[in-house]
Every structure is written in C-alpha cells, then in structure tokens.
Amino acid sequence: KTTFKTIKSGVKTGFMGPPNANAAPEASDKGQLMDTQASYAIPLALGTFNATNAPHALTHLVSTITRSNADDQGIARPPYSLMTGFIGTASISEALSANGKHAIAYGLLTTKTYPSWLYSVANGATSIWERLNSYTIENGFGGNNSMNSFNHYSFGAVAAWMYTHSLGIQRDPESPGYQ
C-alpha cells in the first residue's frame, strides 16, 4: 500500500503539474504532450489525477470525443469516434461515467460511424472485432488486418461498463461475491 501511494504521488507531481493551457514543455521534460482520448481516460479511470487536475482532464477528454480527430492515416473521423487505441478502450466509458458524463459515454457507445463499437454491428458482425479496421466499407478486408480476430476481448471491454452503468449491476465492496 505504501509503494502504491509513493508511485501515485510521484506520477502526480512528476507528470501532472497544475493545469495551464498555455504551458510549454520545459527543456528538461521527456516524452510528448498527448491530447488523445486514452491520455485522459486511463488516468481518470484509475484515479491518478489530483482534485485540481481531474476536472481539466475531464474537459479535455470530452473535447477529444466531441470533436473530429485524425486517425493514424491522417483521415478526419467524425465526433464520437472511438480513438482510444487498444489500451485506452477499457477505460474510456468508466472514466466518463465516474465523472458524471454518462450521456457522452452513451453517445460514444451508440455511434455507428467508423470507427465505433456499433460500426461492426451495422456491417454484420455478431462479435467484437480485435481491430476496428478489420472491415470497412471503403477497404473491405484490405485494411491493416493481417493479425486479426473477429471475436476478441479488447474492444469488448465496454461490456463491463454496460453491466455496471446500463444494467445497474454494481459490486458491493462490503460484501463481495455471489450471495
């Protein structure tokens, strides 16, 4: 528990200073500033942001969802496109709902344009694909899908959010397990 608190504190102070939209990176900073769905969703879902930064991160997360974003090929995708990548997908809906943005989370879930969870369903899928570009109307199966499963968990992680937030099935931390 002490190690967790030490690491969490170090991340907050080392990587997440006070919010300032005009702050430029320091010469000693390493890495890149990221303005992506995953860069906000993951730390929000894990509770990494402090009380000062969390509302700003949430505002930026909502912005990354409600605006058009360019994909890896530079093609502009419409608002409410799922642009989290493999790792951020499991965190985005929970990050939104945990911070009172249920309508944004539902909007993201119910979008049918590419790339989204329901795009594959609208195109005949009966399971969750490993890659959002497994099949597209524009490219058929000709996209970057050499390593691909048409029944995969990663993008299906939204199901946990659906159980807890759509169906209301919540765990009771005081009484875990089935009774």
Give the predicted meaning of each segment:
Residues 1-179:
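Active-site core of glycosidic bond-cleaving carbohydrate-active enzymes
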